Every structure is written in C-alpha cells, then in structure tokens.
C-alpha cells in the first residue's frame, strides 16, 4: 500500500502571521502617504462593517493595496513609479 510522502519542503510561516505582517507593512506605508485621521476613519468603517474578523483584515489589506497602487500610479512625489507629466517646449517638442 502506498503512503503519502513526508513533507520535505521548507518550513513556512502560518498564514495568519504572514497576513498580519503584510497588514503592518501596508499600514506603515499608508501613514507615509495619507492623513492619519483619514486612515483611522477607514479602519473604523472596516471594523463597523466586518467586526474583528479575518474578512475585515482581508478587506483592509485589499483596500490599502488598491489605494497605494493608485496613489503611486498617478504620481506620488515620494516614489519613482508614478506618472509625472513632462514639460514641453513652446513648439510642443520635448527636445532641448
């Protein structure tokens, strides 16, 4: 009779620890780019909607990821990823 192979892969962190670490990283980054009262209100909204649940945790992670992505994409001045409109010369060319 065949037996299932023993787990020989690398040790992995439990999923909940990893999720909490991701949330902490997102919070640190969000505080650098958004007003604290605004983030506090977002957290209150999530807590009111989901309570103290894993669904609430997943929701706040998803929302913070989306907000930070959009913020960087439209041109955060703290980042090199954003779209910064280039100035054009009088004739419309970008040559010097």
From Swiss-Prot:
Phosphoserine carried by residues: 79, 94, 96
GO biological process, one term: DNA-templated transcription
Protein's UniProt keywords contain Transcription regulation: yes
Keywords: Activator, AIDS, Apoptosis, Cell cycle, Host G2/M cell cycle arrest by virus, Host nucleus, Host-virus interaction, Ion channel, Ion transport, Modulation of host cell cycle by virus, Phosphoprotein, Transcription, Transcription regulation, Transport, Viral penetration into host nucleus, Virion, Virus entry into host cell
Cellular component, GO annotation: host cell; host cell nucleus; host extracellular space; virion component
Disulfide bonds: none
Subcellular location: Virion; Host nucleus; Host extracellular space
Coarse class of the protein's main subcellular location: virion
UniProt-listed Pfam families: VPR
Keyword field contains Transport: yes
Region annotation Homooligomerization: where it falls in the sequence: 1-42
Record's comment on post-translational modification: Phosphorylated on several residues by host. These phosphorylations regulate VPR activity for the nuclear import of the HIV-1 pre-integration complex.
Function text: During virus replication, may deplete host UNG protein, and incude G2-M cell cycle arrest. Acts by targeting specific host proteins for degradation by the 26S proteasome, through association with the cellular CUL4A-DDB1 E3 ligase complex by direct interaction with host VPRPB/DCAF-1. Cell cycle arrest reportedly occurs within hours of infection and is not blocked by antiviral agents, suggesting that it is initiated by the VPR carried into the virion. Additionally, VPR induces apoptosis in a cell cycle dependent manner suggesting that these two effects are mechanistically linked.
Misc note: HIV-1 lineages are divided in three main groups, M (for Major), O (for Outlier), and N (for New, or Non-M, Non-O). The vast majority of strains found worldwide belong to the group M. Group O seems to be endemic to and largely confined to Cameroon and neighboring countries in West Central Africa, where these viruses represent a small minority of HIV-1 strains. The group N is represented by a limited number of isolates from Cameroonian persons. The group M is further subdivided in 9 clades or subtypes (A to D, F to H, J and K).
Subunit organization: Homooligomer, may form homodimer. Interacts with p6-gag region of the Pr55 Gag precursor protein through a (Leu-X-X)4 motif near the C-terminus of the P6gag protein. Interacts with host UNG. May interact with host RAD23A/HHR23A. Interacts with host VPRBP/DCAF1, leading to hijack the CUL4A-RBX1-DDB1-DCAF1/VPRBP complex, mediating ubiquitination of host proteins such as TERT and ZGPAT and arrest of the cell cycle in G2 phase.
Similarity comment text for this entry: Belongs to the HIV-1 VPR protein family.
Name used for this protein in its record: Protein Vpr
The organism of origin for this protein: Human immunodeficiency virus type 1 group M subtype K (isolate 96CM-MP535)
Origin organism lineage: Viruses, Riboviria, Pararnavirae, Artverviricota, Revtraviricetes
Name of the coding gene: vpr
């Amino acid at each position: 009779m065949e037996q299932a192979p023993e787990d020989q892969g690398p040790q992995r962190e439990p999923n909940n620890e990893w999720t909490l670490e991701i949330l902490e990283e997102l919070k640190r980054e969000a505080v650098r780019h958004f007003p604290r009262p605004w983030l506090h209100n977002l957290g209150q909204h999530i807590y009111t909607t989901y309570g103290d649940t894993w669904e609430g945790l997943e929701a706040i992670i998803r929302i913070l990821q989306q907000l930070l992505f959009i913020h960087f994409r439209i041109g955060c001045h703290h980042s090199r990823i954003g779209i910064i409109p280039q100035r054009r010369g009088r004739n419309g060319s970008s040559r010097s």
